[in-house]
Regions:
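Short coil/turn segments that connect the beta-strands within blades of beta-propeller domains
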Residues: 24-26
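Eukaryotic protein-protein interaction scaffolds centered on beta-propeller repeats
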Residues: 1-16, 34-136
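Cysteine endopeptidase catalytic domains of the caspase/legumain-like
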Residues: 78-475
Length: 475
């Protein structure tokens, strides 16, 4: 059962119980009889946003353009009814309309119309109906670890765009679009021990609306092998654009490389370290390195991607890593030349490891985003979207140019704390193993404290671990 949100062009005020006016920003809050809370701009007479509270602290906040934020439950259980015709689940439009940063801007009375060009709710609804996906596998158990996943994708009027397969939350395949009205697929999968949850979804041809996910659960009770650890460490000090030069990105990547290579053998059969530094860090070389690693990494293995350099959040709400050969000509150059969320998703989908971690120690250049408050919300939004797109646990430094250039004890602050955590300080239960959650909590506590001591403001790392937690380091 889904709850309905009606989006109409006129947005009339229903009966109300109470109102509140804020003279500082000329916003009128109306508490309606139907439980909705609507906030209006008195100067323009336009609706700013709608807030809907539910039981147990669940909520959704959405703007007239369709941008939304809210709890996971609300996102999965609410649908839009657009102009009385199109019913679309919020979850189907997450990739385009989940924008807590824009909702926050709207809450402050700001105009966000420029961000809605081409991706507003009405534009997305007009792009065509999402296809239907049907997984054909029926067996709930498998005697073999390796299975073939069979499924069909049917065009419902909006065409068939990219197709995504997830295994236990991790994106493992991003396929090309199809011109057939019904497309048949078979894809090999390697299961993990226990129950495996597989989902398949497909976008419409415009890549704006995702289908309802088809879900298949299958159990395999075989024996897993002791994992091997693969680390890809990437760092850029020397950019083609001299204004982007950094001091500690390469030393930081080298420190991570060294730390993981010398750990105890209790956890892994072997440790493999791959590196890309400075001029070697291009979009082409990154993709090539992932392709090479995909031939070696097995399901039971652990994969860690560590990236140090410049990163930014584009106006489309997505994170971009800036490669060494990047030249800043305009904001559009970021989406054209940067390593995008889509690039990262495709690269990470090649990696078979069931346990993985993405660490982005990237600083925001002041040339891209100058408002610190807005930048923090934008970063959180981008990391949420990146982690959902890839299915990989993600931790991001979210530093700025000042801390990146000055450093902390010969390293960037984030990586200094990361290495200190791996040195044993993150091992809260003193069992000799450092888990993903332990390391993340240590970083989350230490980085803000140390940045405040040195620079007078708190650097807040962003993280989205999903439901993953596993030991990544043995002392």
């Amino acid at each position: 059962t889904k709850l309905l949100l009606k989006i109409k062009k006129d947005n009339p005020i229903a009966g109300f119980e109470n109102v509140a006016f804020n003279p500082r920003n000329n916003l009128l809050t109306v508490f309606q009889d139907d439980g909705l809370i609507k906030v209006w701009n008195i100067e323009t007479g336009k609706l700013q946003y709608t807030f809907i509270p539910f039981e147990e602290s669940e909520y959704i906040t959405y703007t007239p353009e369709g941008f939304f934020t809210g709890t996971e439950w609300a996102t999965k259980n609410l649908v839009y009814l657009v102009d009385g015709l199109d019913i679309i689940e919020l979850d189907q439009m997450y990739d385009k309309l989940y924008r807590p940063d824009l909702v926050a801007a709207k809450l402050q009375g700001k105009d966000i119309s420029a961000y809605a060009k081409g991706i507003s709710l009405s534009d997305i609804a007009a792009s065509g109906v999402a296809p239907a996906v049907n997984i054909l596998n029926k067996n709930s158990t498998s005697q073999s670890r390796d299975i073939m996943l069979d499924f069909s994708v049917t065009d419902k009027g909006g065409g068939i765009g990219s197709v995504n397969i997830t295994l236990n939350g991790r994106v493992i395949r991003v396929s090309d679009r199809s011109k057939n009205s019904v497309a048949q697929y078979s894809w090999p999968l390697s299961l993990s021990r226990g129950e495996n949850t597989i989902t398949v979804s497909a976008y419409n041809d415009a890549e704006k609306i995702e289908s309802v996910k088809s879900v298949y659960k299958v159990s395999w009770q075989g024996k897993e092998e002791k994992p091997e650890l693969y680390v890809l460490a990437v760092g850029i000090n020397q950019y083609r654009d001299k204004s982007l030069q950094l001091n500690y990105a390469v030393p930081d990547a080298q420190a991570v490389q060294k730390k993981f290579s010398v750990q105890n053998t209790k956890l892994y059969n072997a440790v493999h370290i791959e590196c890309l530094f400075d001029s070697d860090v291009t979009k082409k070389n990154i993709s090539k390195k992932f392709s090479e690693l995909s031939l070696r990494i097995k399901t039971d293995d652990v994969f860690i991607l560590y990236v140090a350099g410049h990163g930014t959040v584009h106006k489309d709400g997505d994170y971009y890593f800036i490669p060494a050969d990047f030249r800043y000509k305009s904001e559009d150059e970021i989406s054209l030349s940067g390593v995008s969320k889509t690039d990262l998703t495709k690269n990470l989908s090649l990696i078979n490891a069931s346990k993985s971690l993405v660490i982005l120690d990237t600083c925001n250049s002041g040339a891209f985003i100058s408002d610190k408050g807005q930048r923090g919300m934008s970063e959180k939004t981008a990391i949420d979207r990146l982690s959902r797109a890839t299915g990989h646990a993600t931790i991001v430094a979210a530093g700025d140019s000042q801390s990146a250039m000055e450093g902390y004890n010969g390293h960037g602050l984030f990586t200094y704390v990361l290495v200190e955590g791996l040195n044993g300080k993150a091992d809260t239960n003193k069992d000799g193993f450092i888990t993903l959650t332990e390391l993340s909590n240590y970083i989350d506590n230490e980085v803000p404290n140390l940045s405040y001591e040195k620079w007078g403001y708190e650097q807040i790392p962003q993280r989205d671990l999903g439901k993953q937690d596993f030991p990544i380091y043995a002392e």
